[in-house]
Amino acid sequence: GEAQLEKTLELAGLRRGEHYDAQVTIKDERGDRHLPDFVIRLPEGKNLIIDSKVSLVDYERAVTAETDAERATALEAHARAVKNHIDALSAKDYANLPGMESPDFVLMFMPVEPAYIEVMRSQRELFNHGYQKNVVLVSHTTLMPILRTVANLWMIEHSNREAREISERAGD
C-alpha cells in the first residue's frame, strides 16, 4: 500500500521531502513514538496524515473464493478488518500529536480500488463509523482530488511568495 500511495502522491505533483515525508517518527507528550505512513505538508505549517496499512487478506480470499458462501464470509471478514483498522488508527490520535497542526482527521488509504468499493457497497455505515472516529476512508480515486488540491495550494503559496519578494524589491 505504501508504494502505491507514494506513486499517487507523485502523480498528484507532490515531491518527497518538499511536500510530504514518509515514515516520520513523532513523539507524544509521554515520549511514546508514533510512525505515520505519510505526513503531507500543507501551507502555513499544517499537516495531513495518511495511513496505508489496511489488511486486504480477507478481500483476496473473497476474490479467490469458489462458492458464494465462502465469498460472503470473506467479505464480512474484510469489512471487520477495515473497521478494526479504523478503530486502531483512531486510537493512535495522530492528528493531535505535538507539532502536527493537522485537521482533526486522518486519511486511511485503501490501495485496491475494488476492495474499497466492495466495503463501501456492502457496509455503507463503515464510512460514517470512520468519520465519527476522525478516520476518512479513501481510495486512489477519492484521494487524488484531495492531493491535487494540496498541490494547487502549494502553487498558490509559491506564487504569493514570489509576488511578495518582487514587491519588497520594488520598494527598496
Listing of model-derived features with the role each one plays in the protein:
Residues G1-D172:
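Amphipathic, heptad-repeat alpha-helical coiled-coil/stalk segments that mediate oligomerization
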